[in-house]
């Protein structure tokens, strides 16, 4: 399990560096380990510094501060010191006593407010609101966290899509859970007609204004306010990230096949590209890693096998449930729903929609032509 999480962290860091380094702004990477994660602290911090060493050529002439917050681990100074010696002069590594609770003070001392900030949180205190808010203080801010699924406040029964809360006048309708749909891998049936819809180098750089790009932060429509999560999902890690200031968030449970405790992995970001990269990383994890994925919002707790082309049946059921709950949606809206509210990628939606349309479980408008983003998908009603 720890090896899988380290691999995901390292690859997410690589994706983050690709976006941040080219901008030439001072940046901060903060790693915070609480009680229960101290054994993983050394290996995770080493993995991060190893990634930075691999990108040493791109980091030369750049200013990057790495904060490692952990208590009670005597191996850290020696093992990280050896790796720090291989990094470019502009990369500084600082060990800070304490766990996630010290993150707000540490990132402030490092001048991370208003500069690119990537945070990784593991262990006790990782979901504290003040800690998550500190991770959102970067411009941009991105946060990856892992926590036990049995901690108070991380049990979910349903979670609305971000797109749904963005729609003006969207009705608050009961959710039709994915588990209510047939579990068969055959043709997807339509739902019934009755379905209800610390010490670090100071210094920072001000945010750099510029025209919007495809990597621009997600936002609501002009003049609108980013909605907070509804009360019924107030215990969700994903909802906590949204409340902390991350416009985009997603979560997935990592379930070991050996029966050991599952862990919840969540990402908060402001960039579509980062969220897409995270999902791509998830589905390219080694299929023999000994874990399965689970949607925290699925009451039936179905397990998803890792594959380059995941089986579309569970996503079909989830999309049908979303359509039954909210009414007709465009392909673009369904792609966003899959990206934020399920473990799936947005590219998986086309395959699922094709199966839904072919089986007669859903209809499209217009009826013919390319399945573009503006095509409207509707649940097919039985006579």
What are these regions (language model features)?
Residues 58-59, 134-140:
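Short, conserved loop/helix-junction motifs that constitute active-site signature segments
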Residues 139-153:
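Conserved beta-strand signature within the Rossmann-like core of class I S-adenosyl-L-methionine
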Residues 155-220, 224:
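Long, intrinsically disordered low-complexity tandem-repeat segments
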Residues 156, 218-269, 310:
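A conserved mid-domain beta-alpha-beta active-site/ligand-binding segment of alpha/beta enzyme cores
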Residues 264-277, 284:
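Core SAM-dependent methyltransferase catalytic element
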Residues 281-383:
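C-terminal target-recognition/interaction regions appended to catalytic cores
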């Amino acid at each position: 399990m720890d090896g899988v999480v380290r691999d995901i962290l390292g690859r997410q860091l690589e994706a983050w560096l690709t976006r941040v380094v080219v901008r030439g702004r001072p940046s901060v990477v903060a790693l915070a380990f609480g009680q229960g994660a101290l054994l993983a602290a050394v290996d995770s911090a080493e993995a991060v510094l190893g990634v930075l060493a691999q990108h040493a050529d791109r980091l030369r002439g750049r200013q990057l501060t790495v904060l490692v917050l952990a208590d009670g681990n005597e191996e850290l100074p020696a093992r990280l010191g050896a790796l720090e010696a291989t990094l470019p002069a502009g990369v500084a590594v600082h060990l800070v006593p304490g766990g996630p609770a010290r993150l707000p003070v540490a990132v402030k001392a490092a001048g991370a407010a208003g500069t690119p900030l990537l945070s990784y949180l593991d262990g006790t205190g990782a979901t504290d609101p003040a800690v998550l808010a500190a991770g959102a203080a970067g411009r941009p801010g991105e946060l990856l966290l892992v926590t036990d699924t049995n901690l108070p406040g991380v049990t979910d029964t349903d979670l609305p899509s971000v797109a749904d809360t963005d729609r003006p006048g969207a009705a608050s309708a009961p959710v039709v859970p994915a588990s209510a749909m047939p579990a068969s891998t055959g043709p997807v049936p339509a739902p019934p007609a009755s379905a209800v819809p610390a010490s670090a180098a100071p210094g920072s750089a001000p945010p750099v204004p510029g025209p919007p790009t495809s990597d621009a932060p997600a936002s609501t429509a002009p003049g609108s306010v980013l909605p907070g999560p509804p009360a019924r999902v107030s215990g969700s890690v994903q909802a906590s990230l949204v409340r902390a200031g991350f416009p985009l968030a997603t979560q997935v449970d990592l379930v070991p096949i050996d029966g050991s405790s599952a862990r919840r992995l969540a990402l908060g970001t402001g960039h579509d590209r980062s969220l897409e990269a995270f999902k791509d990383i998830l589905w390219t994890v080694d299929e023999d890693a000994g874990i399965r994925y689970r949607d925290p919002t699925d009451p039936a707790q179905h397990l998803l096998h890792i594959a380059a082309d995941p089986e579309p049946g569970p996503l079909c059921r989830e999309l049908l449930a979303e359509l039954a709950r909210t009414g007709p949606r465009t392909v673009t809206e369904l792609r966003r729903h899959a990206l934020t509210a399920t473990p799936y990628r947005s590219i998986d939606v086309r395959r699922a929609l094709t199966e839904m349309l072919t089986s007669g479980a859903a209809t499209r408008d217009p009826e013919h032509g390319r399945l573009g983003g503006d095509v409207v998908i509707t649940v097919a009603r039985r006579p």
